[in-house]
């Protein structure tokens, strides 16, 4: 059986990166919520 998690920087950035978040209304909500909370990092590394 193959491992379920295969890390890939590009794929990760495309799905949960800053630019990906800015593309959708929901993503913008996520960013604004994290700004409101005072998060040091708006996106997960």
Swiss-Prot record:
Biased amino acid composition, Basic residues: 31-45
GO biological process, one term: translation
Keyword Iron: no
GO molecular function, one term: structural constituent of ribosome
Keywords: Ribonucleoprotein, Ribosomal protein
Single GO cellular component term: ribonucleoprotein complex
Region annotation (Disordered) ranges: 23-45
HAMAP family, sorted: Ribosomal_bL34
NCBIfam families, per the entry: rpmH_bact
Protein family membership: Belongs to the bacterial ribosomal protein bL34 family.
This protein's name: Large ribosomal subunit protein bL34
Species whose genome carries this gene: Elusimicrobium minutum (strain Pei191)
Gene name of this polypeptide: rpmH
């Amino acid at each position: 059986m193959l491992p379920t998690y295969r890390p890939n920087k590009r794929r990760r950035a495309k799905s949960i990166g800053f630019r990906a978040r800015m593309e959708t209304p929901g993503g913008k909500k996520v960013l604004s919520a994290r700004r409101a909370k005072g998060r040091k990092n708006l996106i997960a590394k």
